[in-house]
């Protein structure tokens, strides 16, 4: 028989689960009419950091952990911003922080200390990464042994070091990828080889279409295009998704068209729009650190660095060793706003600004690209004109 029941049921979970239940279960919204969506982040201000420090102390007491000194608390706050990839925000999800505190307390106990210091918080973070970085170590070994080809010095035409992020669930890391471009006269446009073999996702393909539109609008606004070009991620055997490499792909194309070598000591990340603006991307810290690790493994020269979108500067929460190398001028992080900024850094040649007629200064990168594309277009039109002087279509001996 039915039993009388008067209760309140409260569900806690991820927002996307709530959205799915509301979409697929018609009774769910009737049963759970009041929804509260808690934000997982908050602004990082002096006041919020004080509140955060109190919360850390409360968590330590609740877990019966040793107290943290001020430097340890500061390191936990830094790590919180790092988890969000935003130095202006703090994570409100306490479970991740509690795990760090427990492990830091363990290291303090092993050393016989009554207080958790910054050293033990850092050791907790480092050991958590070490337990999960087998794949990263394997990829770095492949690069070190020359199995995976990545240049970090010298110059190459039509070749740029792009950067990607591999997400293993509980650990993310960045890795460089060689992006190459080849160009010739033709009418096939820019061919994305990843898309042709169904390894490139829709967002990546969108990025290639955007850079194709940028090329045509900037350099040949009133002439038919006569370009056949190919873009590929070398030694890539899995799916590629996202548009964060579209600027690197565009730089490879510009280098090939201008016949201008690109510095291999600089890696690139950032998406591009049709106006040539460089747009922000995700995983900026992991990408910088991924290229830094390769350069550091081979020896830092002071000439190496990474180009990032200027709008990503507020997201920088780099590892301490990377920050130290930047401070000592042994490694650089360049923030750019436009395609022109990036191509000048990579080639050392001025990009050049157009005049009222859309012509770029002689000797500039943009002028060299413009001349190559105009040559292709004029040559293609001359071939078409010669063909039209022959027999009309349909003439000749019937079969």
Q: What kind of feature is each model-predicted range?
A:
Residues 20-95, 110-115, 221-226, 259-265, ...:
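Conserved C-terminal "switch" segment of AAA+ ATPases
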């Amino acid at each position: 028989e039915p039993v009388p029941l008067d209760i309140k049921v409260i569900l806690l979970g991820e927002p996307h689960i709530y959205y799915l239940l509301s979409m697929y279960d018609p009774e769910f919204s009737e049963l759970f009419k009041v929804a509260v969506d808690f934000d997982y982040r908050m602004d990082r201000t002096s006041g919020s950091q004080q509140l955060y420090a109190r919360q850390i102390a409360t968590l330590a007491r609740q877990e019966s952990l040793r107290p943290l000194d001020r430097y340890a608390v500061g390191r936990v706050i830094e790590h919180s911003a790092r988890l969000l990839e935003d130095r202006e925000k703090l994570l409100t999800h306490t479970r991740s922080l509690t795990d760090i505190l427990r492990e830091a307390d363990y290291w303090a106990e092993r050393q016989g200390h009554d207080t958790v210091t910054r050293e033990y918080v850092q050791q907790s973070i480092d050991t958590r990464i070490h337990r999960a970085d087998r794949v990263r170590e394997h990829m770095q070994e492949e690069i070190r042994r020359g199995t995976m080809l990545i240049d970090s010095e010298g110059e190459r035409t039509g070749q740029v070091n792009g950067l990607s992020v591999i997400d293993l669930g509980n650990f993310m890391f960045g890795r460089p990828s060689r992006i190459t471009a080849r160009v010739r006269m033709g009418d096939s446009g820019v061919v994305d080889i990843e898309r042709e073999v169904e390894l490139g996702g829709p967002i990546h393909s969108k990025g290639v279409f955007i850079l194709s539109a940028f090329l045509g609008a900037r350099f040949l606004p009133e002439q038919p295009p006569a370009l056949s070009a190919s873009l590929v991620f070398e030694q890539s055997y899995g799916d590629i998704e996202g548009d964060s490499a579209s600027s690197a792909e565009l730089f490879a194309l510009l280098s090939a068209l201008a016949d201008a070598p690109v510095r291999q000591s600089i890696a690139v990340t950032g998406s591009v729009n049709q106006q040539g603006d460089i747009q922000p991307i995700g995983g900026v810290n992991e990408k910088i650190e991924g290229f830094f690790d390769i350069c550091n493994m081979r020896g830092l020269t002071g000439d190496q660095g990474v180009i990032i979108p200027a709008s990503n500067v507020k997201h920088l929460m780099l590892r301490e060793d990377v920050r130290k190398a930047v401070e000592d001028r042994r490694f650089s992080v360049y923030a750019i706003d436009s395609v022109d900024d990036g191509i000048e850094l990579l080639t050392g040649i001025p990009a050049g600004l157009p005049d009222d007629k859309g012509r770029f200064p002689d000797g500039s990168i943009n002028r060299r690209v413009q001349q190559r594309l105009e040559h292709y277009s004029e040559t293609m039109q001359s071939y078409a004109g010669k063909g039209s002087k022959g027999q009309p279509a349909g003439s000749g001996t019937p079969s």
